[in-house]
């Protein structure tokens, strides 16, 4: 006999249909989520198994009530509600996983680097834009590198300046300083160096009228073959002194070797001063400042430090000013205790000696770069940088920070950090950290030297301030790294 359609039956049929739809949505989402959990093993087993078991049990419960005869309307309604709720929760989890996967894709090593070339004019110049420059005098120098000549050709396609060529960079800089030319065309990184070492040239007294950017093809730096959850390893943190695109060539002002032993949960931060005198890898003759190694690419910094300390560096992490500010702001700030009192008005940052202070990203960067207030400026700046790094590591390795600020942290770093650490190694480390939540013991060290002034490989016609190597300090640093990595 055909069932008579009643309002009650009609309602039940509608609820049953909606329940089927909600069940299908839940099942599809749950299956996809399970596959993602297997493919990207971020969650430890103690979290992974309960989640999978819960998803299966819920699926069986929904099946039971969907196909059970004479299921009450309120049961169908309850199934719909719970199916949609759990589908939404899984979708929320997808959101986190999507951020994670996207982040690790975005920080892979670049196969190019960006070089910038400036047209610099005095601050009081009447020229306000590059279109006005035609027929004005432009100082250049005899740099026969392909990149400089390419940048100059790109510039002369936009304007027709009266080019005055000088034998070296010093001559070109002096020309614009003395008013013999209206501007100078110089590689951006060299302009910053010249500003530091030439008494008569301060880049703050000049305006960048135009920037020519070149994208140069380079070979990506290969990563080491280690399991970072089991094997000890070294990471070079290279902090470049610029904002914007992380691929931009610049000096490496922060050079910290992070030695990690996952078996003992110990970390050693070994800092090499930016002005440390080193033999750039593959060069002979004049030595150079370590900071200048960054001008020749991250691989030069890595290989030069490996030569200096006699160690292997498996990975690198390249950051810039934007990285520091964004990360610390995403963490909600950090706490440090300055050992000097000073004020920097640019970011309205007050520092008080002996007082534990909460710093946002801008003030943390200011603190990390400060040297003028200290008697031993560059050496003391190393201590400040290690203070910042230790505070960041401590905050990153607390469960509360990871859980509450996870997506903000990833978003803040996605376009301002570069590393050759493979994605699967990150997944393993996150898995281990969530599983064990270990407390990491952080130690510090820095190589030492003696202040001298000598010509360098990059600027051979001027005596620059450098730290002459202290062999005993280098041996000590090398031994400390080796011993920490060897601990069981």
Segments from the language model and where they lie:
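Membrane-interface helix-boundary signature
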Residues: 8-19, 72-75
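Hydrophobic alpha-helical transmembrane segments in integral membrane proteins
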Residues: 90-109
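Non-catalytic, solvent-exposed segments at the cell envelope interface
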Residues: 105-115, 121-123, 129-488
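Cytoplasmic membrane-interface regions of multi-pass membrane proteins
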Residues: 64-73
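Internal/C-terminal transmembrane anchor helices
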Residues: 73-96
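Membrane-embedded alpha-helical segments of integral membrane proteins
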Residues: 14-65
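Short, Lys/Arg-rich, polar N-terminal cytosolic tail immediately upstream
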Residues: 1-7
């Amino acid at each position: 006999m055909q069932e008579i359609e009643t309002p009650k039956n009609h309602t039940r049929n509608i609820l049953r249909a909606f329940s089927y739809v909600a069940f299908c949505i839940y099942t599809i989402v749950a299956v996809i989520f399970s596959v993602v959990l297997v493919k990207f093993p971020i969650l430890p087993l103690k979290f992974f198994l309960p989640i999978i078991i819960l998803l299966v049990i819920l699926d069986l419960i929904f099946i039971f009530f969907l196909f059970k005869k004479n299921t009450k309307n309120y049961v169908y309604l309850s199934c719909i509600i719970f199916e949609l709720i759990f589908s939404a929760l899984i979708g929320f989890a997808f959101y986190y996983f999507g951020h994670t996967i996207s982040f690790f894709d975005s920080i892979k090593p670049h196969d190019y680097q960006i070089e910038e070339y400036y047209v610099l004019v005095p601050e009081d110049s009447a020229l306000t834009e590059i279109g006005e420059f035609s027929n004005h005098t432009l100082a250049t120098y005899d740099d026969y590198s392909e990149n400089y000549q390419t940048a100059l050709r790109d510039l002369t396609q936009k304007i027709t300046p009266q080019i005055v060529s000088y034998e070296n960079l010093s001559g070109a800089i002096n020309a614009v300083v003395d008013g013999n030319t209206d501007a100078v065309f110089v590689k951006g990184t060299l302009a910053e160096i010249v500003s530091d070492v030439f008494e008569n040239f301060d880049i703050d007294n000049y305006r960048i009228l135009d920037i020519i950017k070149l994208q140069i093809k380079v070979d990506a730096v290969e990563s080491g073959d280690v399991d970072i959850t089991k094997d000890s390893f070294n990471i070079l943190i290279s902090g470049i002194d610029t904002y914007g695109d992380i691929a931009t060539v610049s000096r490496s002002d922060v050079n910290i070797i992070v030695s990690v032993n996952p078996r003992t949960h110990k970390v050693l931060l070994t800092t090499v001063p930016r002005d440390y005198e080193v033999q750039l890898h593959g060069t002979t003759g004049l030595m150079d400042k370590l900071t200048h190694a960054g001008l020749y690419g991250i691989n030069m910094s890595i290989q030069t430090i490996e030569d200096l300390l006699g160690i292997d560096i498996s990975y690198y992490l390249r950051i810039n000013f934007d990285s520091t500010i964004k990360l610390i702001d995403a963490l909600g700030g950090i706490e440090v205790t300055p050992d000097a009192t000073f004020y920097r008005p640019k970011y309205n940052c007050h520092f008080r000696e002996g007082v534990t202070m909460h710093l946002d990203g801008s003030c943390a960067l200011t603190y990390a770069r400060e040297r003028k207030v200290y008697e031993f400026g560059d050496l003391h700046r190393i201590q400040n940088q290690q203070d910042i790094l230790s505070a960041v590591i401590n905050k990153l390795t607390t469960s509360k920070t990871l859980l509450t600020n996870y997506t903000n942290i990833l978003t803040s770093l996605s376009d301002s950090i570069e590393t050759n650490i493979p994605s699967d190694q990150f997944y393993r480390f996150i898995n281990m950290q969530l599983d064990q939540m270990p407390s990491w013991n952080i130690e510090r060290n820095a190589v030492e030297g003696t202040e001298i002034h000598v010509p360098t490989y990059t600027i051979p016609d001027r005596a620059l301030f450098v730290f002459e190597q202290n062999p005993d300090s280098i041996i000590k640093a090398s031994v400390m790294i080796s011993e920490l990595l060897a601990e069981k």
